[in-house]
UniProtKB/Swiss-Prot annotation:
Keyword Nucleotide-binding among record annotations: no
Name of the featured protein: Talin rod domain-containing protein 1
Organism: Homo sapiens (Human)
Gene3D superfamilies: Alpha-catenin/vinculin-like (1.20.120.230), Talin, central domain (1.20.1420.10)
Subunit note: May homodimerize. Interacts with F-actin.
Disulfide topology: none
Length: 362
């Protein structure tokens, strides 16, 4: 998962490379790191908004893209998985600091991708553990599944939006075959999940309108996707500004089609019923979600610090400030992991933690 530098404390990292060495590095790895920072930050914030800031108690079932398979685990299994992942997160936090300090922006970007995926997985497991702990309290009634998993389809919508945003914002010179392949595969994977999920919901719907609307929504989405992916293939075969502009042009209808389909699919009648829990169950849930929020908030700050450093590679007072913020945010990640582990072990809050209905992660 990470390099051998993991043996050092999280708050420490390798000595910074000379400013001249960092400033002389190719701008391409830095630009990619900025892009990775934006994507990881958006993904972590979305998952936190959906799973940690919700007042509802629902299981988190991981099927389809980015599955971690933990949805059917017991609380004890979730707890052990989360604690193990906090250790991996500490390793990655140290690695990304070291790589950045040595001017290895490409490696830092790769580590950040892994860190972002790990935070998402940890958040999903934490939300599921919080649900399991809450429904285990006296008087609790478990959630009833609906036709659609709001979390999964909303994640897919976000990924499609991100892929289309990349196509709109990337200059022609940076549209490498590898980037186009990654975007195409990401779009196809998430669109397939949406298609399968909505087809299943259509089959199980009781009223005629819903059955037909799911089918029509999928058809609209598929048509828009085919038009966009044809433009992406054209850019790969015959790159030109005209071909690139077509990607931007046809990405709009796909985003609109996916937004409409997910908006319909997440109407209350398709989502089942959240668990009913007592005040005791709510307190247990809040403690675990609050611990997870401490981790996510710190990782969002870490990502923002990395972005600032990637954009200001030439030294100076700002660079020193950014490095200090990076060290502080890395320490906050470590502290958040400790709080989450303690909340899971004790099923109570080790300190006053943010309420689950607070504002979105900033």
């Amino acid at each position: 998962m990470a390099s051998g530098s993991a043996g050092k404390p999280t708050g420490e990292a390798a000595s910074p490379a000379p400013a001249s060495a960092i400033g002389g590095a190719s701008s391409q790895p830095r630009k990619r790191l900025v892009s990775v920072c934006d994507h990881c930050k958006g993904k972590m914030q979305l998952v936190a908004d959906l799973l940690l800031l919700s007042s509802e108690a629902r299981p988190v079932l991981f099927e389809g893209p980015a599955s971690s398979g933990a949805g059917a685990e017991s609380f004890e299994q979730c707890r052990d998985t989360i604690i193990a992942r906090t250790k991996g997160l500490s390793i990655l936090t140290h690695d990304v600091q070291s790589q950045l300090n040595m001017g290895r922006f490409g490696e830092a970007g790769d580590s950040l991708v892994e860190l972002g995926d790990l935070v998402v997985s940890l958040t999903e497991c934490s939300a599921h553990a919080a649900y399991l702990a809450a429904v285990a309290t006296p008087g609790a009634q478990p959630a009833q599944p609906g036709l659609v998993d709001r979390y999964r389809v909303t994640r897919c919508r976000h990924e499609v939006e991100q892929g289309c945003a990349v196509l709109r914002a990337t200059p022609l010179a940076d549209m490498t075959p590898q980037l186009l392949l990654e975007v195409s595969q990401g779009l196809s994977r998430n669109l397939k999940f949406l298609t399968d999920a909505c087809a299943l919901a259509s089959d199980k719907s009781r009223d005629r309108f819903s059955r037909e609307q799911f089918k029509l929504g999928v058809k609209c989405m598929s048509t828009s996707a085919s038009a966009l992916l044809a433009c992406v293939r054209e850019v790969k075969v015959a790159p030109s500004e005209l071909a690139r502009s077509r990607c931007a042009l046809f990405s709009g209808p796909l985003v609109q089609a996916v937004s409409a389909l997910v908006g319909f699919a997440t109407e209350p009648q398709f989502l089942g019923r959240a668990a009913a829990v007592s005040a005791e169950g709510k307190a247990v849930q809040t403690a675990i979600l609050g611990g997870a929020m401490s981790v996510v908030s710190a990782c969002v700050l870490l990502t923002q610090c990395l972005r600032d450093l990637a954009q200001h590679p030439d030294g100076g007072a700002k660079m020193s400030d950014h490095r200090e913020r990076l060290r502080n945010s890395a320490c906050a990640v470590s502290e958040g992991c400790t709080l989450l582990s303690q909340a899971l072990r004790e099923r109570s809050s080790p300190r006053t933690l943010p309420p689950v209905n607070s504002n979105s992660v900033n």
